[in-house]
Swiss-Prot record:
SUPFAM superfamilies: Type III secretion system domain. May be involved in the regulation of the assembly of the type III secretion system (T3SS), also called injectisome, which is used to inject bacterial effector proteins into eukaryotic host cells. May control the polymerization of the needle. It comes from Aeromonas salmonicida subsp. salmonicida. This is Probable type 3 secretion system regulator AscH. GO terms for cellular component: extracellular region; type III protein secretion system complex.
């Protein structure tokens, strides 16, 4: 017996479609949640645990996260922490872009810079701090940029022209999203 609108015979059950595979993002989230014991590192550091001991037993991503939390507190060890955070990125950027010649080609150079920066940290606000630190390190004693680093200086400035307004908008959204804009 055939039912209208169906190509199936009456006694057969329609075949079930296989469920779509789990999304990659969902699997990554589950993996990150499974590694949650590292989330109390900052509290343990505040309670007096030695920083070297905490950093010795965790994954590189957790190390970086703990160092950023300590750096953002602005306490006494912040300059040493800043060196640990900024030195690897600065060294890689200087090695990769230090000897290139101007002009900066936005379509080629900026995506390469962004990809290099994302290897170290995906957050735009942290990349902004790293680039500002890079600009200060590129300057010599008189405040001038050496000729071999002019390209990297221009490239970092171009990226900061994007990052600073972007981070400002995100900051405004986070701070003022609960307020109504009645003037608009």
């Amino acid at each position: 017996m055939k039912i209208e609108g169906s190509d199936q015979l009456g006694g057969e059950q329609p075949q079930r479609q296989p469920l779509p595979p789990e999304s990659m993002a969902q699997r990554q989230l589950e993996r990150l949640l499974a590694k949650a014991p590292e989330s109390d590192l900052f509290e343990r550091w505040q309670q007096g645990a030695p920083l070297e001991g905490l950093l010795a037993v965790v994954a590189p991503a957790a190390k970086r996260e703990l160092l950023w939390q300590i750096y953002q507190q602005g306490n006494k060890p912040a300059p040493e922490i800043g060196k640990q955070l900024f030195a690897p990125v600065t060294d890689k950027l200087i090695a990769r872009f230090g000897e290139r010649q101007s002009p900066v080609l936005d379509a080629i150079d900026l995506p390469e810079l962004r990809a290099t920066m994302r290897e170290f940290d995906p957050l735009a606000s942290r990349r902004e701090k790293v680039l500002l630190n890079l600009l200060s390190e590129l300057r010599d004693g008189q405040g001038a940029v050496p000729a071999e680093h002019l390209f990297l200086d221009a490239l970092a400035r171009r990226e900061l022209m994007t990052l600073i307004p972007l981070n400002g908008m995100v900051d405004n959204l986070m701070r003022n999203s609960h307020k109504l804009d009645l003037e608009a």
